């Protein structure tokens, strides 16, 4: 899968609230009421990631979950990252 160009990434990110570009990755931090809610969200993220066969880097800090998406094989952001970011945004809404 090919990397997306800068203009395409910027345009597509306008459609996915809360997600930002950070270098060659898409990132977002979700904040929950407590650790239990954060972990429940992470488990749902894991299910979606398995279905998509595309796995984010996940950092958990008590009630905060930081997600980072990139396609290592392509060396940057691809349609797979955009598609998973969309699904994760829907999951959190």
From Swiss-Prot:
SUPFAM superfamilies noted in UniProt: PCD-like (SSF55248)
Record bears the keyword Lyase: yes
Enzyme class: lyase
InterPro entries in the cross-refs: PCD_sf, Pterin_deHydtase
Catalytic activity: (4aS,6R)-4a-hydroxy-L-erythro-5,6,7,8-tetrahydrobiopterin = (6R)-L-erythro-6,7-dihydrobiopterin + H2O
Keywords: Lyase
GO biological process terms, semicolon-separated: tetrahydrobiopterin biosynthetic process
EC number(s) reported in the record: 4.2.1.96
GO molecular function, one term: 4-alpha-hydroxytetrahydrobiopterin dehydratase activity
CDD domains per UniProt: PCD_DCoH
NCBIfam families: PRK00823.1-2 (NF002017)
Family (UniProt): Belongs to the pterin-4-alpha-carbinolamine dehydratase family.
Protein name stated in the entry: Putative pterin-4-alpha-carbinolamine dehydratase
Native species: Thermomicrobium roseum (strain ATCC 27502 / DSM 5159 / P-2)
């Amino acid at each position: 899968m090919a990397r997306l160009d800068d203009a395409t990434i910027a345009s597509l990110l306008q459609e996915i609230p809360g997600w930002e570009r950070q270098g060659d990755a898409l990132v977002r931090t979700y904040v929950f009421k407590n650790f239990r809610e954060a972990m429940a969200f992470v488990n749902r993220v894991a299910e979606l990631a398995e279905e998509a066969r595309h796995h984010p880097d996940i950092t958990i800090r008590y009630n905060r979950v930081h997600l980072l998406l990139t396609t290592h094989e392509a060396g940057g952001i691809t349609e797979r990252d955009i598609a998973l970011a969309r699904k994760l945004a829907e999951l959190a809404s």
